[in-house]
Structure formats: structure tokens, C-alpha cells
């Protein structure tokens, strides 16, 4: 009995154990190709000899301050500056431009596109910065 058992064990060791892998059941009719490794490109030379200058710098973003009556009311009551800004500028770029140009920390930016096609930005300043002082420093009061 033990000899027969040993012979059987020897046979399985020589054959190797190949478990049957269960077939994956496909539930969808479409085959989605699996995502493979995509290495980042390493070009031999630059395709442009000179990089393009920044299209929107802080001087292009803020076109001019608005000093209408309603804008003055915003400055006095809400600690908010009102600017006419570039149409392609977004809130993040406007915030960065105000920070660089006027060295104040904007808390919140609200924007709207006016009926004449220009963009207006309401820049709410932090409590420690006074909008009236900043407006005087800019020179639109």
C-alpha cells in the first residue's frame, strides 16, 4: 500500500500540479483594451527654439480699476476692490495678479461678464488690509 502511494506521489511530482484556471466570464459585449504602460516622452531636441512668453501676465490680467459710485460703495462697505480684467483671466490668475501688483491678500474673487463683453472682478480683501488704503495707493480715488 505504501509503495503504491509513493509511486503515485512520484508520478504527480514528475507531472507537476497544474490546477485548472477558472475561465473569466465576460458580461459585456464590448472588449475594453487594458491600459498599458505609457512612458513619458524624451525628445531628442526641442520642437520650438524659443518658448512663448507668458500670454497673460499680471499687467495684462488687470486692465484697470473701476471707480463708479457702486464700486466706491463696495470699497467702503464691503472692503472689496472692483477691476476690469482680461476676458480669459480666471479667478486664480486674478488673485495672483492682485497679490503681485498690490501686495495685498485677496480672500475671495467674484467675476461677471458685462453686457458689453468685458469681464469685471470683485476682489474681496482680508480684514487686515483696508480697501480704501489700497485704492488710494493705486491712485483711483
UniProtKB/Swiss-Prot annotation:
Record's keyword annotation contains RNA-binding: yes
Phosphoserine found at: 68, 70
Keyword Ribonucleoprotein: yes
Family annotation (PROSITE patterns): RIBOSOMAL_L23
InterPro entries xref list: Nucleotide-bd_a/b_plait_sf (IPR012677), Ribosomal_uL23-like (IPR013025), Ribosomal_uL23/eL15/eS24_sf (IPR012678), Ribosomal_uL23_CS (IPR001014), Ribosomal_uL23_N (IPR005633)
Superkingdom, taxonomy of origin: Eukaryota
GO terms for cellular component: cytosol; cytosolic large ribosomal subunit; preribosome
GO BP terms in the entry: cytoplasmic translation; cytosolic large ribosomal subunit assembly
Similarity comment: Belongs to the universal ribosomal protein uL23 family.
Subunit structure, interactors included: Component of the large ribosomal subunit (LSU). Mature yeast ribosomes consist of a small (40S) and a large (60S) subunit. The 40S small subunit contains 1 molecule of ribosomal RNA (18S rRNA) and at least 33 different proteins. The large 60S subunit contains 3 rRNA molecules (25S, 5.8S and 5S rRNA) and at least 46 different proteins. uL23 is associated with the polypeptide exit tunnel.
Note: There are 2 genes for uL23 in S.pombe.
Annotated protein name in UniProt: Large ribosomal subunit protein uL23A
Species name: Schizosaccharomyces pombe (strain 972 / ATCC 24843)
Amino acid at each position: 500500500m505504501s509503495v503504491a502511494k509513493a509511486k503515485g506521489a512520484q508520478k504527480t511530482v514528475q507531472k507537476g500540479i497544474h490546477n485548472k484556471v477558472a475561465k473569466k466570464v465576460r458580461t459585456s459585449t464590448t472588449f475594453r483594451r487594458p491600459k498599458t504602460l505609457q512612458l513619458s516622452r524624451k525628445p531628442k531636441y526641442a520642437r520650438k527654439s524659443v518658448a512663448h512668453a507668458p500670454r497673460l501676465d499680471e499687467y495684462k490680467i488687470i486692465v484697470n480699476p473701476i471707480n463708479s459710485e457702486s464700486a466706491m460703495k463696495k470699497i467702503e462697505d464691503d472692503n472689496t476692490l472692483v477691476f476690469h480684467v482680461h476676458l480669459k483671466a480666471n479667478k486664480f490668475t486674478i488673485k495672483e495678479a492682485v497679490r503681485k501688483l498690490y501686495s495685498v491678500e485677496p480672500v475671495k474673487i467674484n467675476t461677471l461678464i458685462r453686457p458689453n463683453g468685458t469681464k469685471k472682478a470683485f476682489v474681496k480683501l482680508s480684514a487686515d488690509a483696508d480697501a480704501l488704503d489700497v485704492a488710494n495707493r493705486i491712485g483711483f480715488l
